[in-house]
Amino acid sequence: LADLLEEYVFPLALDGMPADDAEIILNPSGKFVQGGPDADTGLTGRKLMVDSYGTFAPHGGGAFSGKDATKVDRSGAYMARYIAKNIVAAGFAQRCQVTLAYAIGEKEPVMVDVNTFGTGGPCEDDCLSAAVRKAYDLTPAGIIKQLDLLNPIYNRTAAGGHFGREDFPWENIEHMSDLAAY
């Protein structure tokens, strides 16, 4: 397998990419042996556009309802919303989209991207992306703790939507100064 990867996959995947910047993550969580209903109930993915932002913002295709807080499809989306709202509330931008990308088996996101759509101040998008990595614990455990996701709130999200309701912790803007130190 290593020979096939070296000879065929890597040259195509890395074409035009500087080798110093390339990171190839191949099954970092190890052997995957559990499947079927024991590993996945199949109860997600029914309301993707309704549960997110419609066609206004892109999303990775992962559903929220039916997943617990350890699944970054759900908790990562909540954390991205939380960070974006706090960036705007702190005055770093008038408009903001935060993208978090995770790889299976990796605790930290493989990508953190802040896009202020040109509405940011002196701290450019790259600067804000770096500050977000430093200011927030973006591991699943860190997100669960920050947003108190072990509380029984999920019936309310399924019935009334996941975003735009101030009673959810990811809508809180009380920590808008968290980024200022970075």
Place the predicted regions along the sequence by residue:
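Internal helix-turn-beta structural module
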Residues: 95, 102-182
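Alpha-helical support elements that line or immediately flank enzyme active sites
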Residues: 67-91
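Accessory "access/gating" subregions that flank catalytic or transport cores
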Residues: 2-48
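Short beta-strand elements
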Residues: 37-57, 100, 112-119
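Flexible, glycine/charged-enriched surface loops at secondary-structure junctions
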Residues: 11-28, 90-99, 140-147
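Conserved active-site and cofactor/substrate-binding residues in soluble primary-metabolism enzymes
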Residues: 3-4, 45, 74-78, 82, ...
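Glycine-rich, flexible beta-strand/loop modules in the N-terminal catalytic cores of phosphate-handling
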Residues: 1-3, 44-69
